[in-house]
UniProtKB/Swiss-Prot annotation:
GO terms for cellular component: cytosol. Binds 1 K(+) ion per subunit. One of its GO terms (molecular function) is deoxyuridine phosphorylase activity. This is Pyrimidine-nucleoside phosphorylase. The gene is pdp. Induction: Induced by deoxyadenosine and thymidine. Repressed by DeoR and glucose.
Length: 433
């Protein structure tokens, strides 16, 4: 088999066989196929697309290119949630204990964040003592006993994806549905998920700017999952403005605690219930989404979800007293209100740029080596569709330095006020097949 023949075949719009796809993935991973041939095939896929079968084969070839995590020692159906990213996305912190309170096993592998704010692990490390350095046996024991644990991404999972991802980044082939879908799904499957719930974001702060693109990506991933024996559902949700009010690590932990009590921001509360319902149904702990939702609301009300969060923190060395006393979380030295310059209705909050503003305060990383300041960030005081008076705070900056002029300028550039505006729809579509 020659790589050049595979490239020409795809260039001509023909379907590649399972063997051809495996030949490419294995050869590219072990270095016998050079970058220039891999980038030629990526470009051919970009223009000629792939069938559902090819996408499933590409996904599984990437899964099998490295180690996989075997979670079969964990009882029950392991459901994993993946978000395509966004700003102020605190859903994992709320969802993990929430669904675990209904005996859905949450065996979560999470990464650190690059960009606007930290990843889930950075957020959890805002809690004194919390660590993710668990052995595999400890991890499995905790999930079997308490239904929830988080471990750092480890091992050599999907090396083919890591290599191909870096190549796509520099060859203009990032925006290809088959390549994005197989990349995301290969990571989830290699990490041992039996079933997968996807939160595909759309809008200004999202990778997929239009609802059509988001729906196409969501359907592609759901079909891959179902074709390789992993039941998959997706939610298309809005990221034209940040989710919730908090952007920053300790601030988001506090917001997660409020949400577990049923007192969180409306949009975060709604998204968590929507995603959580799908997780509960896939884990076979409820027959319908409505039944699942009612059960989730019940464990929020009766305090079981909050207790589960405390157990989870304690199990991993964290100070669980922060749940009752969030002032023990890292605190910023300065709180600076940014007032509205005019009256009206908030018409736009550019999510990714507000994320960058939080990063300028120190809430995120520009490079892997950067240190994150867990205390700093931004609290939105208004959301799109809210009325605002002149002089009323639009946001509050939590900072550890007094001079934040460039952050204030960024806030003014990216929060717009108009005569009228409607709140955007949060949940666009549910995709189940």
């Amino acid at each position: 088999m020659r790589m050049v023949d595979i490239i020409i075949k795809k260039q001509n719009g023909k379907e590649l066989t399972t063997e051809e796809i495996q030949f490419f993935v294995n050869g590219y991973t072990d270095g016998s196929i050079p970058d220039y041939q891999a980038s030629a095939l990526a470009m051919a896929i970009f223009f000629q697309d792939m069938s559902d079968r090819e996408r499933a084969d590409l996904t599984m070839a990437m899964v099998n290119s490295g180690e996989t995590i075997d979670l079969s020692a964990i009882e029950g159906i392991k459901v994993d949630k993946h978000s395509t990213g966004g700003v102020g996305d605190t859903t994992t912190l709320v969802l993990a204990p929430l669904v675990a309170a209904l005996d859905v096993p949450v065996a979560k592998m999470s990464g650190r964040g690059l960009g606007h704010t930290g990843g889930t692990i950075d957020k959890l490390e805002a809690i004194m003592g919390f660590h993710v350095e668990l052995t595999k046996d400890e991890f499995i024991k905790l999930v079997n006993r308490d239904k929830v644990a988080v471990i750092g991404q480890s091992g050599n999972l999907t090396p083919a994806d890591k290599k191909l991802y870096a190549l796509r980044d520099v060859t203009g082939t990032v925006n290809s549905i088959p390549l994005i879908a197989s990349s995301i799904m290969s990571k989830k499957i290699a990490a041992g998920a039996d079933a997968i719930v996807l939160d595909v974001k759309t809008g200004a702060g999202a990778f997929m700017k239009t609802e059509e693109d988001a729906a196409e990506l969501a359907k592609a991933m759901v079909r891959i999952g179902n074709n390789v024996g992993r039941q998959t559902m997706a939610v298309i949700s809005d990221m034209s403005q940040p989710l919730g009010f908090a952007i920053g690590n300790a601030l988001e932990v506090k917001e997660a605690i409020d949400t577990l009590k049923g007192e969180g921001p409306e949009d975060l509360h709604e998204l968590v219930l929507t995603l959580g319902s799908q997780m509960v149904v896939l884990a076979k702990k409820a027959d319908t989404l409505d039944e699942a939702r009612a059960k989730l609301e019940e464990v929020m009300k009766n305090g079981k979800a909050l207790e589960k969060f405390k157990d989870f923190l304690k199990n991993q060395g964290g100070d669980s007293s922060i749940v009752d006393d969030p002032s023990k979380l890292p605190q910023a030295a300065y709180q600076i209100d940014v007032p509205a310059k005019e009256a009206g209705v908030v018409s736009e909050i550019v999510a990714d740029e507000i994320g960058v503003a939080a990063m300028l305060l120190g809430a995120g990383r520009a490079t892997k080596e950067d240190e994150i300041d867990l205390a700093v960030g931004i609290m939105l005081r208004k959301k799109v569709g809210d009325k605002v008076e002149k002089g009323e705070p639009l946001v509050t900056l939590y900072a550890n330095r007094e001079n934040v002029d460039e952050v204030i300028a960024k806030v003014y550039d990216n929060i717009r006020i108009a005569a009228e505006a409607k709140a955007p729809k949060l949940i666009h579509t549910l995709i189940t097949e």
